[in-house]
Swiss-Prot record:
Its EC number is 4.1.1.19. Keywords: Cytoplasm, Decarboxylase, Lyase, Pyruvate, Virulence. The record marks T52, S53 as: Cleavage (non-hydrolytic). Its main location: cytoplasm. Part of the AaxABC system, catalyzes the decarboxylation of L-arginine. The arginine uptake by the bacterium in the macrophage may be a virulence factor against the host innate immune response. This is Pyruvoyl-dependent arginine decarboxylase AaxB. Belongs to the pyruvoyl-dependent arginine decarboxylase family.
């Protein structure tokens, strides 16, 4: 029996940061710092697969904090994510990293929800920052990107944009910040039949 394309129906938002004085080339911040950020985000025991940024309407109202679903996580499972994540080195002049994910929902001409889109944001800073700076920068750039997603498709905004962000002031040699949406439950669209 054929199955149609798969789409998520439950998601969670999460984030984490990590830092280390140790690392392996060619991207030393990917090794220890990334693992620490995954641990803080509570997704360290998944096999992470990145998505692009289109959200089915079934996710509207079904995006929860990671703490609501962590007890259901399966060690070694595949986790499909939309993730903003980057590392940096203080040796190269970066002393803070901010990451964020934003979500917009669109409606058709009758006001019916058609689905959504996500945008990812990463910014490096030459000095330490605080949460107010991290949040304001994330919202500013994500708002611009989300509005572009709607304008590109000539779609009207259905509801308020949603924003999630994280940041790190790097105190060691390397640092990493990530913000992510993870997808847990799925359904299948009707299979396609070509006649």
């Amino acid at each position: 029996m054929p199955y149609g394309t798969r789409y998520p129906t439950l998601a969670f938002h999460t984030g984490g940061v990590g830092e280390s004085d140790d690392g392996m080339p060619p991207q030393p911040f990917e090794t220890f710092c990334y693992d620490s950020a995954l641990l803080q985000a509570k997704i360290e025991n998944f096999n992470i697969v990145p998505y692009t940024s289109v959200l089915p309407k079934e996710l509207f109202g079904n995006i929860v904090p990671v703490d609501q679903c962590v007890k259901f996580f399966k060690h070694g499972a595949v986790l499909e994510v939309i993730m903003a994540g980057r590392g940096a080195s203080t040796v190269e002049g970066t002393h803070a990293i901010t990451t964020g994910v934003g979500i917009c929902w669109g409606q058709d001409k009758n006001g019916e929800l058609i689905g959504g889109w996500a945008a990812e944001y990463v910014e490096f800073f030459p000095t330490w920052i605080n949460d107010e700076i991290a949040e304001s920068h994330a919202k500013m750039w994500l708002k611009k990107s989300l509005q572009h997603e709607l304008d590109l498709r000539s779609v009207v905004k259905h509801s308020e944009f949603q924003y999630f962000h994280n940041y790190i002031n790097i105190k060691q040699k390397y640092g990493f910040s990530l913000t992510a949406l993870g997808f847990l439950n799925f359904e299948n669209a009707d299979p396609v039949t070509i006649k």
